[in-house]
C-alpha cells in the first residue's frame, strides 16, 4: 500500500505532459529532434516517433532493426545513439555491441526505411577480452567519430568512413563528448575516471591525425554527461 501511495504521489507531482511521455516511452536511450516538431527516440531497441501533437508511434520494431544488423550481432540497446542524417537520410542509428562491433543504420524517408551503411569489428587497442560501451559519437560529412570505454578502464575513439567502410583509431584518451567543428577539428571533453590523477579538460582534436591541444581545465572529481555549444 505504501508503494502504491508513493507512486500515485509521484505521478501527481509530475507535469501531465512529462508523465505521459514517461509512461509511454520507458528506458529511452537516445533522442533526436527532427523536422516539423517531430522527435525520434530509441527505446528497448525500437525506434519511436512523437509528432507535434505529442502522440507516440512505433516506426521500427526490434525485429526489423535486428534483421538489418550483421549475423551474430548482439545490439547493446542501452547505448544506441541517434544522429542527424544527410543526403536524404532521416537519421542514423548507431548500434554497438559489447564485443567491440558497431553497426550504423540509415533511416530514410517518412517510413524510416532501414539501410545498413557500416558494420565492422573495430580494431580495439587491448589484448584482453573486454566489454565495450559507446560513450559518445558525432558526424562530420561521411565520417562518424565514436568514443568507447571498456571495463578495463581503456578508451578508444575511432573515425568510421561511411563512404568506403574503413575505420581507424584516432585517440586512446577518455573522450566523453565529441563535437565536429568547421575547421576539420573536433571539440572533445577529456574526462578521466574520478580516481585518475589526470584532470578533465576541453581539448581540440585533429580529425585526421588525432593530435590534441588542451583548451581549458574543468572542475575536478566530476563526471560529465553532455555539453552544448553557444557561439
Regions found by a protein language model. Give the residues of each.
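Short coil/turn segments that connect the beta-strands within blades of beta-propeller domains
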Residues: 36-37, 87-89, 141-142, 183-184, ...
